[in-house]
């Protein structure tokens, strides 16, 4: 039986994803002592794990290097490309928010300047509202943009809101909820249908148990 390759997002989401996989009965013990390794193998199942950056999960799945990927909905939305999304994993929950300083007027007709790491998501949001805005892409700490008068407001991912508060910002609008999603390579799904659907069944059961706790 061919080993399924699962691309996991490095970082915060990795920890939650591994915990969910373990709860679903997937052995991930090889990942506990990873050092500089980026490829791991389950000792009990024909499954391998690849640790990559979030945006690269989609690339590995698209090209069939990975059969399955676990990645945040925010990354999928910003990529705005077609991905075969099969399951909401109910982990890594947060949301896109519009935030700024207390003196910001969201109802102003003046053309606003919006700073964000997610220009595609921001454009979609304001287009749906019928607003014409200027969008500035920022790769680093976007929270300081309104404070330094680079932008009128920001669009960013918010989990607890503590970082916004620490920088004197408040949330003006909650936009889109986000969580980790399981995406699948379409060719892999045809070739490994039984294996992939068995894994999905295991994950669905683990998610139900997690939500019931």
From Swiss-Prot:
InterPro entries: ATP_PRibTrfase_cat, ATP_PRibTrfase_CS, ATP_PRibTrfase_HisG, ATP_PRibTrfase_HisG_short. It catalyses: 1-(5-phospho-beta-D-ribosyl)-ATP + diphosphate = 5-phospho-alpha-D-ribose 1-diphosphate + ATP. Its main location: cytoplasm. The keyword Transcription regulation does not apply. The keyword Transferase applies. It comes from the Bacteria. It is found in: Cytoplasm. Pathway: Amino-acid biosynthesis; L-histidine biosynthesis; L-histidine from 5-phospho-alpha-D-ribose 1-diphosphate: step 1/9. One of its GO terms (cellular component) is cytoplasm. Its EC number is 2.4.2.17. PROSITE patterns: ATP_P_PHORIBOSYLTR. It holds the Pfam family HisG. One of its GO terms (biological process) is L-histidine biosynthetic process. Keywords: Amino-acid biosynthesis, ATP-binding, Cytoplasm, Glycosyltransferase, Histidine biosynthesis, Nucleotide-binding, Transferase. One of its GO terms (molecular function) is ATP phosphoribosyltransferase activity. Lacks the C-terminal regulatory region which is replaced by HisZ. Catalyzes the condensation of ATP and 5-phosphoribose 1-diphosphate to form N'-(5'-phosphoribosyl)-ATP (PR-ATP). Has a crucial role in the pathway because the rate of histidine biosynthesis seems to be controlled primarily by regulation of HisG enzymatic activity. Heteromultimer composed of HisG and HisZ subunits. Belongs to the ATP phosphoribosyltransferase family. Short subfamily. This is ATP phosphoribosyltransferase. The gene is hisG.
